[in-house]
Amino acid sequence: MNIIVRPYGKDSCYCRPDTTWERENRDLYSPDCVNEWYWAPVMFTRVSKAGKCINPKFAERYYDSVNFGILLYAGNSEIAFSSCTDHTSILPAPLYNPVVMENEENMFEVFKQGETIFRTGTAHRGLLEDSICRASQMTSLRIGDMVAIELSHISLLAGRSEGEIRLEASYCENSLSDFRIIF
């Protein structure tokens, strides 16, 4: 299983290994070599049908569920290094039916220490389908792969001087994740 990521504002994609997938809300203990954590909020989908070079008019046939999550990046390093740290792809389950995205009142929110640091409505279905098509140009999509689209630029989340932070996320007023980053 791959986690295929489309960086914010880019047409290209890269893959994260499945060892980065965190689905149990476990706290992240920062390795000694990492002094800062960066992050990006994402919308993601699970691929439900294998495909290669998917035509945009058929993209909706290749996924059956969606959700929102968080990607963490270790330090301000190259993507290949910073995106491979274990438990840094916070892509929660269960996933929602794509129809939920059509209601713009459903909000995805991320909180750091109880303060909102990101909030968005959910009208991104076209971006999701475009990302599936672009990802399938570079790699063969398999059932179970995740396609994640960054919803903003990567930005600083926490530094070693903070000691510990709590990060929470919700969608449709339901809790998606709640964990700490501990330095």
What are these regions (language model features)?
Residues 1-146, 153-183:
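Catalytic-core "active-site belt" of small-molecule-metabolizing enzymes
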